[in-house]
Amino acid sequence: MITNTAAYQFVTIQHPQTLAASVLAQAEQQALKGSVLIAEEGINLFLAGDAEQIGAFYAWLQADARFARMRIKYSESAYQPFARLKVKIKPEIISFRRDDASPLQGRAPSVTPAVLREWLRNGQDDRGRPLVLLDTRNAQEVVYGTFQGALTLPIDTFTELPGALESHRAALADATVVSFCTGGIRCEKAALWMQADGMDNVLQLEGGILGYFEEVGGEGYDGRCFVFDERVALDPELKPLVDAERPAKTGKI
């Protein structure tokens, strides 16, 4: 079996090139595949490989105090969903292009999967306020599944979210808004931006959809969660939609 991981950490990285070289060397040593994005604002990882080698890599990474509290989300597949290993340096570990949404300057309040499940059952939060679940993902992801009744936006990139949300602001004013995404990274920035833009009723779902699946299952969720690899999407039991051996490349005759 292949162990698949998703993890990120917003933390100041003073020398991204140095960290990238070390991460690449360690991941290659453990024969891992996937993608790692590194920026001055942190690190974002999607890695897959043998369970023991995955464990060794993250033990090495979390020995660094900057990443000691990183939350790692796990799932399994029969086959490797990545073709190669890529480690890249980027301006942001998730592109949003908003200076007022830097998790390095603070973090928006969050709600745990268990609490959100209770709110969904009750149709309101603990204070009796109505709920609006805001899907911060792209339209191509949403078609595979989302929370029941979620507000979805017709966007192709995360940077389009502020403009697409503008027409919904009045409807959100009297509700508790819970922003969510695949693993937490986008909803973390989205919630911060919404707060900075004057919305004080916004929370982020801790761990995103995958964290929700992992902790409480699929209650209140319709369908699967899209992922950016050859598994395509995961169901609430974290089982892949596609789990097949990668076809061998063949040359032209």
Swiss-Prot record:
Transmembrane segments: none annotated. Its EC number is 1.14.-.-. PROSITE patterns: RHODANESE_3 (PS50206). The active site is at C181. One of its GO terms (biological process) is tRNA modification. GO terms for molecular function: oxidoreductase activity, acting on paired donors, with incorporation or reduction of molecular oxygen. It catalyses: uridine(34) in tRNA + AH2 + O2 = 5-hydroxyuridine(34) in tRNA + A + H2O. It comes from the Bacteria. Residues 127-221 form the Rhodanese domain. The keyword tRNA processing applies. The keyword Oxidoreductase applies. Keywords: Oxidoreductase, tRNA processing. InterPro entries: Rhodanese-like_dom, Rhodanese-like_dom_sf, TrhO, TRHO_N. PANTHER family: RHODANESE-LIKE DOMAIN-CONTAINING PROTEIN 7-RELATED, THIOSULFATE SULFURTRANSFERASE/RHODANESE-LIKE DOMAIN-CONTAINING PROTEIN 2. Catalyzes oxygen-dependent 5-hydroxyuridine (ho5U) modification at position 34 in tRNAs. Belongs to the TrhO family. This is tRNA uridine(34) hydroxylase.
